[in-house]
Curated annotation (Swiss-Prot):
The keyword Lipid biosynthesis does not apply. Participates actively in the response to hyperosmotic and heat shock by preventing the aggregation of stress-denatured proteins and by disaggregating proteins, also in an autonomous, DnaK-independent fashion. Unfolded proteins bind initially to DnaJ; upon interaction with the DnaJ-bound protein, DnaK hydrolyzes its bound ATP, resulting in the formation of a stable complex. GrpE releases ADP from DnaK; ATP binding to DnaK triggers the release of the substrate protein, thus completing the reaction cycle. Residues 3-67 form the J domain. Binds 2 Zn(2+) ions per monomer. This is Chaperone protein DnaJ. It holds the Pfam family DnaJ_C. GO terms for cellular component: cytoplasm. A zinc finger (CR-type) spans 123-205. It is found in: Cytoplasm. SUPFAM superfamilies: Chaperone J-domain, DnaJ/Hsp40 cysteine-rich domain, HSP40/DnaJ peptide-binding domain. Keywords: Chaperone, Cytoplasm, DNA replication, Metal-binding, Repeat, Stress response, Zinc, Zinc-finger. Zn(2+) 2 binds at C153, C156, C179, C182. GO terms for molecular function: ATP binding; heat shock protein binding; unfolded protein binding; zinc ion binding.
């Protein structure tokens, strides 16, 4: 075991005031709020234990008689070792685990984002303004007014806990409970930052650049690690989650990664065949309609649908055909239709499965393509 005087960096004849000053200096340097490294935490425990012994006249006298081991030739025994044994077997009530840090991870945030269907095809970039917690610029997350630092708690001497000897069936054991003065932190913010009131963070609006990948769909959540709220006392940021909602489009709908739409063609074009140019989400597409095209026929265009979310390639564009029957004809046009009907004897109307209009036909055709 290290010599307590060497741990504090004082002479063996140091006065109580010198011991206290040495402890305060080391505590400011090694406290978890200031130095979160594992090595600093171990040294802080040694410094705290050394101060606990040397700041108590009876324990110091006993330590001086017994040497570096901390046990003397007389007087009461130090129960801290037995407390460790008790904690090992019974899971609590033993020695202190050290002060807890004020640094905590910030909360996650959820933001709902609406995107247009054309943005789903290729992805989009957005600069989103969010109301969140950011690190206080005045104290840089230290919680203290600039030029000051947390001071060790005078009640628990920086340990963050109060130890008491209690009598039990197993004899006297040491129990530990959080210090009520410093709330278990081991330090006290004597001069809180006036900007954040000692929280190390403030509420503010900030702009978050977001790249929305192609292929997203309504209900999908995108995770942005470290873009959530800043943690207390300079703690790490939480995550930001973006919940996607795809806006309704007047022309195109979506089936998986395929795009669906309906093209209205005249009866003459359906009979004779024709070429049609349609405006897709990513540019014009020229379609060739075969002679004899029927309502609810499907024309598929490869790789003109939605970009796949987790792999390369795109879905298809599926165009459902609706043949528009003229409702107003003049006398000459009616005569031409009659002559056409006389030369093309149609079969008698026959029953088929009920379908609620063209949209039902298209739906069935789309599903069976």
């Amino acid at each position: 075991m290290a010599d307590h005087y060497e741990v504090l960096g004082v002479e063996r004849n140091a006065t109580p005031d010198e011991i206290k000053k040495a402890y305060r200096r080391l505590a400011r340097e090694l406290h978890p709020d200031v130095n979160p490294s594992t090595e600093a935490q171990e040294r802080f425990k040694l410094v705290t234990h050394a101060y606990d012994v040397l700041s108590d006249p009876q324990q110091r006298q006993q330590y001086d008689r017994g040497g570096a081991s901390g046990f003397g030739g007389g007087g009461g025994a130090d129960f801290s070792g037995f407390g460790d044994i008790f904690e090992t077997f019974f899971g609590g009530g033993g020695a202190s685990r050290g002060p807890r840090s004020r640094r905590e991870r910030g909360q996650d945030a959820l933001l709902r984002v609406e995107v247009d269907l054309d943005e789903v095809v290729f992805g989009a970039h957005r600069d989103l303004e969010v109301d969140t917690a950011i690190v206080c610029e005045t104290c840089d997350g230290s919680c203290c007014q600039p030029g000051t630092a947390p001071v060790p708690c005078d009640i628990c001497h920086g340990t963050g806990s109060i130890q008491r000897s209690v009598r039990s069936l197993l004899g006297n054991v040491m129990t530990s409970s959080p210090c009520g003065s410093c709330r278990g932190y081991g330090t006290v913010i004597a001069t809180p930052c006036v900007t954040c009131q000692g929280q190390g963070r403030v509420r503010a609006r900030r702009t978050v650049p977001v790249d929305i990948p192609a292929g997203v769909d309504t209900g999908l959540r995108l995770q942005m690690p470290g873009s959530g709220e800043a943690g207390p006392a300079g703690g790490p940021n939480g995550d930001l989650y973006l919940e996607i909602k795809v806006k309704h489009h007047d022309v195109f709908s979506r089936d998986g990664d395929d795009l669906l739409c309906t093209l209205e063609v005249s009866m003459a074009d359906a009979i004779l065949g024709a070429a049609a140019t349609i405006k897709a989400l990513d540019g014009d597409i020229r379609l060739e309609l075969k002679p004899g095209t029927q309502s609810a026929d499907i024309v598929s265009v490869k790789d003109r649908g939605i970009t796949h979310l987790r792999c390369s390639g795109r879905g298809d564009l599926r165009v459902g055909i609706q043949v528009v029957t003229p409702t107003k004809l003049d006398h000459r046009e009616k005569e031409l239709i009659k002559k056409f009907a006389e030369s093309h004897k149609a079969s008698e109307p026959s029953l088929a499965r009920f379908q609620q209009g063209l949209f039902a036909k298209l739906r069935d055709r789309f599903l069976n393509v």
